[in-house]
């Protein structure tokens, strides 16, 4: 089915995108915000010009841009993720930080026409495909209904957590980001991690794979890392909310390093070419 038709049916509760076979699939729900402690990985992502990353909520991409990234290849198995990323990018260019937070993280609590007004303020900076997608929803539904549908994941974080973990939401960075967005080249790929062969030839300063490892075969994932083409001092980061020793035993070579963070079980694995 067409993306727009599927999205309308999901919001209108006439189609279910909840699958017993796979958590993540072509029309799986999108995260409203990252549930990862992105502030912990910030030091590993500074001044990385060329990046490959999962799309997800788009938050890490906005952080990367703040840190100097100019070329971004981004992939997600869900076809909805890229539409949401472009919505956030357009919103940043047109809304104040407080309006942005209200639109994306407070709209879940209330019906209000002001959210429609915010959308029609930002829509001029959407590309045609994203504009057609979001117009098709706002023409028939309130933002409250859209944002509380299964188009989005119910896994939500507090506004306090979101502001703390995302450097792009610091007032100074947010205002700088408004001018930086148009200088960034973003390429979208609707793909899972194992079907990115066309990108193996590209050279990256950083590849961010979030916690994808938790949902795939670990041996297959390990083999995949060596297929990517990293620049000198380039790295691949894998995020863990927690990790057991059996998984760590799969990554004992010297080009794998694990880093822990204070006051959390979260860890990051850094991979570098030998």
List the predicted regions and their residue ranges.
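S-adenosyl-L-methionine
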Residues: 1-47
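Class I S-adenosyl-L-methionine-dependent methyltransferase module
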Residues: 2-12, 80-183
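C-terminal region signature
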Residues: 41-42, 242-274
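A short acidic, Gly/Pro-enriched loop at the edge of an enzyme's catalytic core
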Residues: 48, 196-208
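Conserved class I S-adenosyl-L-methionine
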Residues: 48-57, 72-75
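A short SAM/SAH-binding and catalytic strip from SAM-dependent methyltransferases
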Residues: 204-219
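Conserved beta-strand signature within the Rossmann-like core of class I S-adenosyl-L-methionine
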Residues: 208, 232-244
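A short glycine-rich, Lys/Arg-flanked "PGG" loop and its adjoining helix->strand segment in the class I
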Residues: 220-235
């Amino acid at each position: 089915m067409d993306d727009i038709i599927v999205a309308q049916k999901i919001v209108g509760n006439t189609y279910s995108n909840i699958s017993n076979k796979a958590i993540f699939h072509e029309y799986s729900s999108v995260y409203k915000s990252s549930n990862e402690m992105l502030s912990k990985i910030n030091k590993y992502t500074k001044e990385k010009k060329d990046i490959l990353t999962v799309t997800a909520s788009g938050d890490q991409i906005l952080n990367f841009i703040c840190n100097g990234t100019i070329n971004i290849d981004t992939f997600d198995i869900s076809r909805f993720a890229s539409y949401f990323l472009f919505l956030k990018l357009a919103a940043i260019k047109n809304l104040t930080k407080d309006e942005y937070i209200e639109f994306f993280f407070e709209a879940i609590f209330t019906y209000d026409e002001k959210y429609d007004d915010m959308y029609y303020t930002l829509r001029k900076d959407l590309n045609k495909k994203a504009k057609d997608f979001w117009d098709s929803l706002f023409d028939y539904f309130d933002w409250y209904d859209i944002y509380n549908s299964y188009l989005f994941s119910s896994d939500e974080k507090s506004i306090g957590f979101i502001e703390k973990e995302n450097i792009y939401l610091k007032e100074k960075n947010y205002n700088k980001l408004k001018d930086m967005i148009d200088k960034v080249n973003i390429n979208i790929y609707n793909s899972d991690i194992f079907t990115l062969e066309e990108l193996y030839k590209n050279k990256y300063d950083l590849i961010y794979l979030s916690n994808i490892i938790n949902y795939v075969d670990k041996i297959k994932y390990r083999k995949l890392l060596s297929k990517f083409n990293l620049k000198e001092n380039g790295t691949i980061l894998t995020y863990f909310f927690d990790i057991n020793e059996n998984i760590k035993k799969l990554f004992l070579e010297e080009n794998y390093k694990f880093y822990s963070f204070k006051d959390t079980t979260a860890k990051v694995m850094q991979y570098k070419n030998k």
